[in-house]
Amino acid sequence: MTNIRKTHPLLKIINSSFVDLPAPSSLSAWWNFGSLLGVCLAVQILTGLFLAMHYTSDTATTFNSVTHICRDVNYGWLIRYLHANGASMFFICLYLHVGRGLYYGSYTYSETWNVGILLLFAVMATAFMGYVLPWGQMSFWGATVITNLLSAIPYIGTDLVQWIWGGFSVDKATLTRFFAFHFLLPFIVTALVMVHLLFLHETGSNNPTGIPSDSDMIPFHPYYTIKDILGFLIMLTALSALVLFSPDLLGDPDNYTPANPLNTPPHIKPEWYFLFAYAILRSIPNKLGGVLALVMSILILAIVPVLHTSKQRSMMFRPLSQCLFWLLVAILFTLTWIGGQPVERPFIIIGQTASVLYFLIILILMPVTSLMENYLLKW
């Protein structure tokens, strides 16, 4: 008798995606981050749902409602900090997942890659709006500064900003709509994840060598299910340690002060996971130029497949490209550090240099190095 998981209309979809899926036998731990992102998304949706049950999106009571969650709701402090630090864990996994794709040439699956870029933008938008919701000082001023950047768009900029604000400043209308969108977007992200997986399963997974592995496939279950579960345990242990021992490590102390439009914090900065893009934004003196550089710092991922000039897919056997890749990683760490520093010497020039190098490596040095490697290998 045929197993029900292979005949049932719903179960056979799950079976072909997570049980009998043929997977390359050589996948390393770098392939764990996709499933870890799924766990992060589930944690965020669940904790967010429970937070939304107690949260009020009215400027008069918002800050107090968050305090109430932490003090009076059963395990409210745990739910709140799991949600806040879960976002950090989400972005750590997200950046490692994108880095894996760049290193091993997974971007040659263009549909999967492009849906992934859409996912990245959607998650960033969700995180930005979520940061506004506690209505602390950094929430308010972060929202004011970042939304104000849209005023750099010629002709329609000012009207666009006021339309997003729902008035002439960030206020009750802004908070209410940000809460609505922050609640809605994770479900759109979930739908996009399904599209992402659909396109991935059309082509099959890449592997560390970048060489087609059709002749050497193994079933996803039990091999990779066990491996993924180990990844879940490690990540959830790290998240639990962060939440239980130093929940405010990655947050900003200014956000424990209620939002005050009359008092500007000394250093306005976003959460740590946006600092690299914020540093690129600040490194250009012109407002519109800065906004374009900010968008391009992430949108540049969309043209990476076009810039692939190597005859090999993966960087596994390309030491020169590997050096450039790790230099790019170092530059991203530098930009993250600079984004959190005040705008003064020597941070300004360091940020500008790192920003130029970031674009230079991706747009020019990597394609040229790939061509040089082709020549050296006589391909």
From Swiss-Prot:
- Give the UniProt keywords, A-Z: Electron transport, Heme, Iron, Membrane, Metal-binding, Mitochondrion, Mitochondrion inner membrane, Respiratory chain, Transmembrane, Transmembrane helix, Transport, Ubiquinone
Report the superkingdom from the record: Eukaryota
The entry's free-text remark on the cofactor is: Binds 2 heme b groups non-covalently.
> Which residues are noted in the entry as heme b b566-binding?
H97, H196
Q: Where are the transmembrane segments?
A: 33-53, 77-98, 113-133, 178-198, 226-246, 288-308, 320-340, 347-367
Which PROSITE patterns does the record cross-reference, listed alphabetically? CYTB_CTER (PS51003), CYTB_NTER (PS51002)
Which family does the record assign? Belongs to the cytochrome b family.
Q: This chain belongs to which protein, by name?
A: Cytochrome b
